[in-house]
């Protein structure tokens, strides 16, 4: 007989939006808790007042075990794509905003209070031709990447495999070298 599996586990205060509009695709064997949303991993977060937000109107691919910590906001806009590699972990109170494409490789560890966004969240319009001067740009974060607390990853960034991003960093350019600490 086939056992019932619960691939998604939800912890604490979680707001889920766009359930019928968005797509969640598991590109891995389904096991219980392969995706954990709102899990408390930081003792200093207030478990009574810290809400996790899951707002996926686009497509989110999960390639293996993934954990979205307490107080995080995951937002994938309509027609946008976010990909989480195997063993993805964001600890808490971080914001992942995707309007086009954000890709995380395998074994990514993201600390708390991060902001990762592929957009400026506003448009700058050319006065000469009416075109958008600041379009969204994809973000690609390689495998075995560790991003320290209170860091900011901006649109258009590519981070190679095996990189450590130090706490309080702002990454606005590509990190092409492997095995570096930024």
Language model regions located:
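Domain-scale signature associated with acetyltransferase and cell-envelope carbohydrate enzymes
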Residues: 1-117, 142-144, 151, 161, ...
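Short, flexible, glycine/charge-rich loop motifs used to bind or transfer phosphoryl groups or to couple energy/partner
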Residues: 56-57, 79, 135-136, 170-171
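Short coil-to-beta-strand initiation/turn motif
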Residues: 72, 153, 169-171
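Short acidic/His/Gly/Ser-rich catalytic and metal-binding motifs that mark active-site loops
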Residues: 118-126
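Short, highly charged low-complexity linear segments
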Residues: 126-129, 172-173
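C-terminal segments of enzyme domains that contribute to small-molecule binding surfaces
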Residues: 128-155, 179-180
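C-terminal/domain-terminus segments
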Residues: 158-182
């Amino acid at each position: 007989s086939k056992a019932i599996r619960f691939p998604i586990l939800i912890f604490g205060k979680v707001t889920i939006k766009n359930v019928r509009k968005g797509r969640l695709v598991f590109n891995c064997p389904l096991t219980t808790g392969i995706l954990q949303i709102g899990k408390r991993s930081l003792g200093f977060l207030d478990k009574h007042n810290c809400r996790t937000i899951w707002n996926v109107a686009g497509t989110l691919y999960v390639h293996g075990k993934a954990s979205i910590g307490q107080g995080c906001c995951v937002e994938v806009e309509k027609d946008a794509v976010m990909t989480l590699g195997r063993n993805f972990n964001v600890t808490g109170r971080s914001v992942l905003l995707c309007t086009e494409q954000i890709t995380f490789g395998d074994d990514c560890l993201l600390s708390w209070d991060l902001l990762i966004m592929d957009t400026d969240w506003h448009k700058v319009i050319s006065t000469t031709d009416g075109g958008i001067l600041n379009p969204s740009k994809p973000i690609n974060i390689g495998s075995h990447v560790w991003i320290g607390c209170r860091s900011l990853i901006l649109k258009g960034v590519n981070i190679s495999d095996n990189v450590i991003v130090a706490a309080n960093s702002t990454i606005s350019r590509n990190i092409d070298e492997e095995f570096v600490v930024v």
